[in-house]
């Protein structure tokens, strides 16, 4: 049994305003990595950050980060360090700001397991007028196989910023409230990758699904992008159409 899901999906829109972003995926084989600062849910990436340790441990943590401080002499840096240790509120504010800075600098690409979910089509694919990309992770061993399932919990993750900052960032990226569990989300998390592109193997994109409300213009734009892809000799991508089921609240998928 494979350790990876057979397929992962990304919902999106396709119109004149974002055709270049769709071209990035279909033609250039690149995924846009968003910053958590751009997420629509302010609770997404919320965390309970702790910074507990001995004075010597906290002093060592501050000392290790003083290389990024410019314009101060070694003596001034030492004074600043000791003043911060003597002021817990100031130290806490610095730790939280550092955590948020690293968090917002991380790049995130989101996927789901379900290409037929009515809410996903409504919320992320222009009210069923958009598209959904299908990826096969085993064809992208250096990228999409790194997608990790999100954990759903009522509690924020606890981040030990003193001893395990990277683990804390990762846990924060992969924790959401259970109200979002219907998304069955997986995420790729790239430190310092916010608002940049992540290349993937062209063979990893296998299918594209048109929403049940996708217009003829949307389908024409998609066909044009697929022609650009074909001109680069990339593997062919199948196109499907989502259709409203005649007597049940669900969509069916069929080839176009």
Short names for language-model regions:
Residues 1-256:
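Partner-binding and oligomerization surfaces adjacent to conserved cores of proteins
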């Amino acid at each position: 049994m494979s350790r990876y899901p057979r397929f992962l999906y990304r919902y999106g829109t396709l119109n004149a305003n974002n055709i270049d972003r769709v071209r990035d995926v279909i033609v250039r084989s690149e995924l846009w990595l968003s910053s958590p600062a751009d997420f629509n849910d302010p609770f997404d990436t919320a965390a309970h950050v702790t910074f507990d340790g001995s004075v010597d441990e906290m002093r060592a943590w501050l000392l290790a980060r003083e290389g990024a401080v410019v314009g101060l002499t070694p003596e001034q840096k030492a004074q600043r360090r000791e003043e911060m240790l003597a002021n817990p509120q100031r130290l806490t504010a610095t730790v939280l700001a550092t955590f948020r800075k690293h968090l917002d600098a991380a790049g995130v690409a989101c996927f789901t397991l379900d290409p037929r979910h009515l809410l996903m089509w409504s919320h992320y694919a222009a009210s069923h007028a958009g598209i959904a990309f299908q990826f096969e992770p085993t064809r992208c061993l250096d990228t999409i196989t790194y997608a990790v399932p999100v954990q759903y919990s009522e509690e924020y993750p606890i981040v030990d910023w003193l001893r395990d900052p990277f683990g804390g960032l990762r846990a924060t990226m992969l924790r959401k409230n259970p109200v979002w569990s219907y998304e069955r989300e997986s995420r790729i998390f790239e430190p310092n990758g916010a608002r940049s592109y992540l290349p993937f193997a062209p063979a990893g994109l296998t299918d594209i699904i048109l929403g049940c409300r996708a217009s003829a213009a949307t389908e024409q734009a998609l066909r044009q992008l697929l022609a650009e892809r074909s001109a680069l000799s990339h593997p062919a991508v199948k196109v499907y159409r989502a259709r409203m089921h005649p007597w049940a609240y669900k969509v069916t998928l069929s080839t176009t």
